[in-house]
């Protein structure tokens, strides 16, 4: 389609070849030839320029995209959608095509913040998906919207109930629990003291929390003492 070709040409006009090499290394799940090399601020600027244009409407219908930057641009074009139903439907249509952490973690339609109660049903669906980045996105939405005033302790159980061997899913689970330790410590800490998480997520949560500026030195010291040294030790402690 000429509209899609025109947008692709705009992306290549913004290409930085040195950045392409750097960015490709950050996304090892993507073939390097699918990364153009456009910096995120420029992608967001282009998304603002294209928002609500006929060209953008055509582009959003053209899935799958080939380039990482096309997927990132697609994600950024969804953020200003004002109608909740449309934003949710378009997000769910797009998620099966998200194939890397950078796009997955980069977007959330702003209207989601005004519909937290309704969004929970979608999050439950996403957490139950067999697609890596759909699950990761669901956990990310729990982290973004439900660790402050909308927090409920059962949401921790939702994230913990996700069972996956995928690194990108489990890393997001750890990130979620580390953030929960900073924002909802009383509810989150028992998940570590009682060793309710798998060993990898348990230890990675502690690592990320210790790296966080939002965790006090005293909390970090206590968390370090909770590290599990081996799978065998964890099993012995649960007997």
Residue ranges and their predicted role:
Residues 1-239:
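Alpha-helical scaffold domains
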């Amino acid at each position: 389609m000429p509209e899609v070709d025109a947008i692709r040409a705009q992306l290549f006009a913004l290409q930085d070849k040195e950045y392409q090499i750097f960015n490709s290394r950050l996304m090892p799940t993507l073939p390097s030839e699918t990364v153009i090399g456009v910096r995120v601020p420029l992608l967001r600027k282009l998304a603002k320029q294209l928002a609500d244009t006929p060209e953008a409407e055509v582009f959003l219908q053209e899935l799958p995209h080939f380039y990482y930057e096309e997927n990132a641009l697609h994600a950024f074009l969804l953020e200003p959608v004002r109608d909740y139903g449309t934003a949710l439907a378009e997000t769910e249509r797009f998620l099966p095509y998200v194939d890397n952490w950078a796009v997955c973690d980069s977007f959330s339609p702003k209207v989601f913040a005004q519909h937290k109660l309704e969004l929970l049903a979608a999050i439950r669906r996403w957490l139950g998906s067999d697609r890596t980045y759909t699950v990761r996105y669901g956990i990310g939405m729990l982290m973004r919207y439900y660790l402050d005033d909308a927090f409920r302790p059962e949401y921790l159980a939702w994230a913990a109930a996700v069972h996956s061997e995928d690194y990108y899913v489990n890393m997001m689970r750890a990130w979620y629990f580390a953030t929960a330790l900073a924002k909802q410590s009383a509810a989150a800490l028992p998940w570590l003291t009682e060793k309710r998480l798998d060993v990898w997520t348990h230890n990675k949560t502690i690592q990320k929390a210790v790296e966080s500026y939002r965790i006090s030195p005293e909390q970090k010291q206590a968390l370090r003492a909770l590290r599990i040294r081996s799978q065998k030790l964890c099993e012995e402690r649960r007997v």
